Regions:
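FNR-like FAD-binding dehydrogenase module
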Residues: 1-508
Length: 508
């Protein structure tokens, strides 16, 4: 395609989120000269998702392209309701038509959809609740046995959950056209659109629903576009088209995103269309279950041949009758002793100092304490721990209900291996958080940072805590105890961040 240089227009779109850096792409041949750029800033955490910016961006893009490169006479652009054919060919046969040996092999594969070079099977040796039975939050310390895993403090364990038996049963009730005993084969139509590696071998439909399709996902707009295309019942088709339209995005948000309505629950609301979904469209409508990352809470030397994770079981209510359940955390809570699960290790974001004489300040409320349990226990096991070098600031609601690993911390403190500072937000009338304890220890913290080159690590929920902790270091530690002006205090913390002496690992 040729274009005069003075005709060239270019659009640029930046993808990002509230907690991440913005990245952007520009596609341009070297001979092109950019004369104008329309920049659209996109936030994936917007209430309406990427569609809040994608819609006007696409409208602008196609208008510019059509003005520069008009379609041939008689050709018309495809409208938004056009749905492309499925990416792959999906076929199935019943188990009665398969060779017995092949059927046995397919059904005997425990986890056919997880393909990782460093994947290992770990056995559950303890699934312990660390919070009291009366506490609203169920938190689990999951201990797994394995001699094949190598990791360092700060690394994360990747876990891929399964759908609940209840949801799997509901899936086949809502979509009776699919036989749980059938064997499915996925083949490519074009080499440009290869079949994902986990789907390249035949697999059991039941295992696919149990282990691959994310039944708990919140469906996005494209799901409703496809469903509207497949719908035959006019009443359902109209509603699906409304949810798929630009004008219906606020209604879609109120129907799906705000109450956290799952894909399976949406299928239940459109029973006629659900019962007619063709097999070819199964992998267009459903997304794969994603592996979850958990900070490793164990120590290679302190817990040999084991790996531990600390998991808050997600359960909350919206306007919907059924409570909202986190897929992975609730699956973990059901794991029984000796259950073997596939896991693998990824490098974490925390980089702890190798010099054991450098003081380390750790702030980890709630399950944010997990990576620090790994690091502190490792230092203790190697005989390198000391109260003058390890400082843990822990926060929770009640001293007797959700003080995770309480006896371990108190024992380390008694042995002079750890300086422990705790904040219990509900044990007294006035709420008390880790940032309040940081303020109280401002002189100590400034001395550690300014004179002893201490490192700071912050882990936990990303909602308010990380920003408030950072503000406390700027205003009370550097500004108060260090007597630095606000600008200098801010630059001091920024320099720590640049040098890797202030590290944060948070999650939503």
């Amino acid at each position: 395609m040729e274009a005069r240089r003075d005709q060239l227009k270019m659009l640029q779109k930046g993808y990002g989120g509230k907690h991440g850096d913005i990245t952007s792409w520009v596609l341009c041949e070297q001979w092109m000269i950019i004369l104008s750029v329309s920049l659209y800033m996109n936030d994936d955490q917007h209430d309406l998702g990427v569609d809040a910016v994608v819609d006007p961006w696409l409208k602008d893009l196609w208008a510019k392209l059509l003005s520069l490169f008009p379609l041939p006479q008689g050709a018309e652009p495809l409208d938004r309701s056009h749905v492309y054919a499925p990416r792959w060919t999906v076929t199935c046969v019943t188990s009665q038509h398969l060779h017995k040996g092949l059927m046995t092999m397919i059904q005997g594969t425990e986890d056919p959809f997880i393909i990782k070079e460093n994947l290992i099977k770990a056995s559950v040796i303890e699934n312990h609740r660390t919070t009291s039975e009366s506490h609203f939050q169920d938190v689990r310390l999951l201990r797994l046995s394995t001699s094949m895993l190598t990791y360092n403090p700060g690394d994360v364990l990747m876990v891929t959950p399964h759908n609940s038996a209840e949801n799997v049963k509901k899936f086949f009730e809502l979509l009776p056209q699919f036989d749980p005993d059938s064997i499915v084969s996925v083949t490519e139509k074009s080499p440009d659109v290869p079949v994902p590696i986990p789907l390249r071998k035949p697999f059991s439909m039941k295992k696919c629903v149990e282990q691959f399709l994310d039944l708990s996902a919140i469906p996005r707009r494209y799901f409703f576009e496809l469903m509207a295309f497949l719908a035959e019942l006019e009443l359902e088709k109209e509603k699906l088209e409304e949810f798929a339209s630009s004008e219906g995005q606020e209604d879609l948000f109120n129907y799906c995103n705000r109450p956290r309505r799952t894909l399976l629950e949406v299928l239940q609301d459109f029973p006629n269309t659900s019962s007619k979904i063709p097999l070819d469209y199964l992998f267009e409508l459903f997304t794969p279950i994603k592996a979850r990352a958990f900070s490793i809470a164990s120590s290679p030397h302190g817990h040999p041949n084991e790996v531990h994770i600390l998991v808050a079981v997600v359960k909350y209510r919206t306007k919907l009758l059924a409570p909202r359940l986190g897929l992975c955390s609730n699956w973990i809570a059901t794991l029984n002793l000796n259950r073997r699960i596939p896991v693998w290790v990824k490098k974490g974001s925390f980089q702890f100092p190798s010099d054991t004489s450098i003081p380390v300040i750790m702030i980890g409320p709630g399950t944010g304490v997990a990576p620090f349990r790994s690091f502190i226990t490792e230092r203790v096991a190697l005989g390198e721990a000391g109260a003058e070098r390890l400082y843990l600031f822990f926060g929770c609601r009640y001293s007797r209900q959700d003080f995770h690993c309480r006896e371990e911390w108190l024992n380390f403190e008694r042995n002079g291996q750890l300086s422990l500072f705790v904040a219990f937000s509900r044990d007294q009338e006035e709420k008390r958080y880790v940032q309040h304890v940081l303020c109280e220890q401002a002189d100590l913290l400034w001395d550690l940072l300014n004179k002893k080159s201490a490192y700071i690590y912050v882990a936990g929920n990303s909602k308010n805590m990380p920003d408030q902790v950072r503000d406390t270091f700027i205003s009370h530690v550097c500004g108060g105890a260090g007597e630095l002006p606000e600008t200098s205090a801010t630059k001091f913390i920024e320099q720590l961040e640049l040098n890797g002496r202030y590290q944060t690992e948070t999650w939503s």
